[in-house]
Amino acid sequence: MNVMQENQIKLIEHIKQGVVQAVGLEEAEVPEILLEVPKDKKHGDYSTNIAMQLARVAKKAPRQIAESIVPELKKDNKLIKEVEIAGPGFINFYLDNAYLTDLVPVILTEDKKYGESDFGKGEKFQIEFVSANPTGDLHLGHARGAAIGDSLANIMKMAGFDVSREYYINDAGNQINNLVLSAEARYFEALGLDSEFPEDGYRGADIISLGKDLAAKYGDKYVHTSEEERRSVFRVDALAFETGKLRADLEEFRVSFDEWFSETSLYEENKVLPALERLRENGYIYEQDGATWLRTTDFEDDKDRVLIKSDGSYTYFLPDIAYHLNKLERGFDVLIDIWGADHHGYIPRMRAAIEALGYSPNQLEVEIIQLVHLFEDGVQVKMSKRTGKSVTMRDLIEEVGLDATRYFFAMRSSDTHMNFDMSLAKSTSNDNPVYYVQYAHARISSILRSGKEQGLEVTKDADMSLLQTEAEYDLLKVLGEFADVVAEAATKRAPHRIVRYLNDLASSFHRFYNSNKVLDMDNLEVTKARLALIKTAQITLRNGLTLLGVSAPEKM
């Protein structure tokens, strides 16, 4: 718990005692006291609507209640500088900013751990994201999902949740059969033999490379074997080739997973039919027209869903249900699935299935990743300059850089369409959001290097009470909000709140820097305090950027 959080608790307790004295309630009767940070600094450091909450119980107007509480709040509290009533009965608090300087040694001590909290209390979450078919390159939607999923996992972990990241390998569907047939055709082609290319095959350059690899590895060994034997071998090689490519691309994107879960394993380990039987035992399965149905309309889905078709084949829904049952049986409290925009209609049926299995539908959360459109110089970009085909994640990283790609994808809420401005992402100006934040970190690093060259090291023993200017206090206030912002971003599943915070922090630092001389050899004690202050800003910028998978450069 940091200084800011401790003071919030103290302030809430002080308000509670003020209510007890002014209104005559017992402590247990006082409703939960909520503190908000006003958007306009003129309205104080914190505000509470407790007077509105008490109006019905006290049978008085909120402002009248506030007027009776405020005198109690002004009594004997060193933390509070001023209290005022606003509007219909809001109570605004202006704090004595001196307490803010206590943050500096705390941040310097916690360093990489600054921002961590036990807010999540170890609740077990699994985040499944990307999960692209192992049949080709990752596209822009996958890239956005990867950036948001990984950032969210980092944020929730820092906020005290127990988080596991998972990639679901769709390796049991018809698309894998097409992959194998495509690899087979390219294998024959690499050996100089005629072969009919499958109508729904994959024609990418990667499949040509795969065919050449197979020819180099096996020679003509599988030319004259049975189709079954050849395709069984090629299936293993093709999946290893494609998943290896996915892993490499994601690792380059600074995204890693705790588990790569194979859909095929559900069948190999007999996980599918037991899930069906559980649904049947719970009374939600029926047979109609030769098919097996799940009665999802019992759980607000718009129609019931087929699990087994009349020809005996499974729909995609049945193994998906088995997979989610497997997740829950592994002990996760909540599952977060990050899906593409085309899966939005799938949410009600999956939540219905979770409930039909006997779990709470609240144990499944779904975050939808909306579409991405690329623009350069105001013109939409649809094709890669390099390949002449659709732009892939790899293409975008090569064009604008890894840091810009990660940061830009985290800037917007996942459920909003995104226009990705490539020109802006490549610019080296303060108009570029990631450049602006990284430049603040680099500038601080430069000042610290200059100080070190003059024999000035950052120390926790500096006299922080010398930090007294408005810009210093404003910077300290923003620094003190970090852990709360992380917890809020975790709760709201909103990495873009970290982006917004980093922009605010960079702005506060730049304002401080423009109005305060840091290295003043004629005033060494103030210089030492300011060096410690900017070091805390550097730490916090770095920690925030790390959550987003973005580097914190020391030189630019």
From Swiss-Prot:
Catalytic activity as recorded in UniProt: tRNA(Arg) + L-arginine + ATP = L-arginyl-tRNA(Arg) + AMP + diphosphate
Name of the coding gene: argS
Enzyme class at the top of the EC tree: ligase
Family label: Belongs to the class-I aminoacyl-tRNA synthetase family.
Major subcellular site: cytoplasm
SMART domains associated with the record: Arg_tRNA_synt_N, DALR_1
Motif 'HIGH' region: positions: 132-142
A GO CC annotation given for this chain: cytoplasm
A GO biological-process term: arginyl-tRNA aminoacylation
Keyword entries, A-Z: Aminoacyl-tRNA synthetase, ATP-binding, Cytoplasm, Ligase, Nucleotide-binding, Protein biosynthesis
Protein name: Arginine--tRNA ligase
Keyword check for Cytoplasm: yes
Oligomeric form and interacting partners: Monomer.
UniProt GO MF annotations: arginine-tRNA ligase activity; ATP binding
EC number: 6.1.1.19
Cell location: Cytoplasm
Keyword Calcium assigned: no
